[in-house]
Amino acid sequence: MITNTAAYQFAPIHDPQQLADSVLERAQQRALKGSVLVAEEGINLFLAGDAEQIAGFYAWLHADARFAQMRVKYSHSAEQPFARLKVKVKPEIISFRRDDASPLQGRAPSVAPAMLRKWMQQGHDDHGRPLVLLDTRNAQEVAYGTFQGALTLPIDKFTELPEALQPHRAALADATVVSFCTGGIRCEKAALWMHAEGMDNVLQLEGGILGYFEDVGGEGYDGRCFVFDERVALDAELRPLGDGAACADAGKI
């Protein structure tokens, strides 16, 4: 059985290449595969391997004060979902190209999965404001599943979100908006940008869809959650698609 992990942390990294080299060395020593991006704004990891080796790797990474609070989301599969290990240094750990959306300058308010489930059951937040769930993922991912009634955007890349959202801004003004994505990283940047744009009614879903599945299951969610590896998509119990479905992006890192 393979242990799969997804994790990220925004933190100042003064020498991204040095960190990338250390991560590569430690991951290789433990025969892990997957994708790691390092930038001056933080680290983004998708790693898979033997459970004991995964635990050892994250114990090492958590010992670094910059990543001590980093949440790791776990799932399991019968096969290794990654073909190789790649560790890269990039300008951003998720490309958004907006100077006013830097998590190093602060963090947008968040909502825990259990609270979001409660709000969805109620149809509004605890102040009676209508609830809008904003899917910040691209159209290919949304096709596999999303939250019931979510606002989805016709985008192919995350950088297209600001323009695609413009026609909806007036309609969102009187609602509590919860941005969400796969694991939390995109919705964190999206929520920050929206706050910078004057939309102070925006929250981010803590841990993203995978965190929601892990904490409370699939209530209020239709379908599966697309992932960028050979598992293709996960159900609410974090099980891979497993039906032989293929995807052009599956397994690419």
From Swiss-Prot:
Any matching Pfam family: Rhodanese
Molecular function terms, GO-annotated: oxidoreductase activity, acting on paired donors, with incorporation or reduction of molecular oxygen
Record has Hydrolase as a keyword: no
GO biological process: tRNA modification
Residue stretches making up the Rhodanese domain: 127-221
Coiled-coil region list: none
Keyword tags: Oxidoreductase, tRNA processing
Reaction equations catalysed: uridine(34) in tRNA + AH2 + O2 = 5-hydroxyuridine(34) in tRNA + A + H2O
UniProt-listed Enzyme Commission number(s): 1.14.-.-
Active site: C181 (cysteine persulfide intermediate)
Superkingdom classification of source: Bacteria
Family: Belongs to the TrhO family.
HAMAP family hit by this protein: TrhO
Functional description taken from the UniProt entry: Catalyzes oxygen-dependent 5-hydroxyuridine (ho5U) modification at position 34 in tRNAs.
Protein name per its UniProtKB record: tRNA uridine(34) hydroxylase
Native source organism of the sequence: Xanthomonas campestris pv. campestris (strain B100)
